[in-house]
Amino acid sequence: MEPVDPNLEPWNHPGSQPKTACNQCYCKKCSYHCLVCFLTKA
């Protein structure tokens, strides 16, 4: 694992960015797309 900057929020860590953009779909797959999706959709 690469070293992580503790000052960065977890979803800003390198390598944690989802490969696809967030969308407005509320299905289970899209709700678990990333932490931001999970917090706003779940």
UniProtKB/Swiss-Prot annotation:
One of its GO terms (cellular component) is host cell cytoplasm. Residues 22-37 are annotated as: Cysteine-rich. Keywords: Acetylation, Activator, AIDS, Apoptosis, Host cytoplasm, Host nucleus, Host-virus interaction, Inhibition of host innate immune response by virus, Inhibition of host interferon signaling pathway by virus, Interferon antiviral system evasion, Metal-binding, Methylation, Modulation of host chromatin by virus, Modulation of host PP1 activity by virus, Phosphoprotein, RNA-binding, Secreted, Transcription, Transcription regulation, Ubl conjugation, Viral immunoevasion, Zinc. It is found in: Host nucleus, Host nucleolus; Host cytoplasm; Secreted. Interacts with host CCNT1. Associates with the P-TEFb complex composed at least of Tat, P-TEFb (CDK9 and CCNT1), TAR RNA, RNA Pol II. Recruits the HATs CREBBP, TAF1/TFIID, EP300, PCAF and GCN5L2. Interacts with host KAT5/Tip60; this interaction targets the latter to degradation. Interacts with the host deacetylase SIRT1. Interacts with host capping enzyme RNGTT; this interaction stimulates RNGTT. Binds to host KDR, and to the host integrins ITGAV/ITGB3 and ITGA5/ITGB1. Interacts with host KPNB1/importin beta-1 without previous binding to KPNA1/importin alpha-1. Interacts with EIF2AK2. Belongs to the lentiviruses Tat family. This is Protein Tat. It comes from Human immunodeficiency virus type 1 group M subtype C (isolate ETH2220).
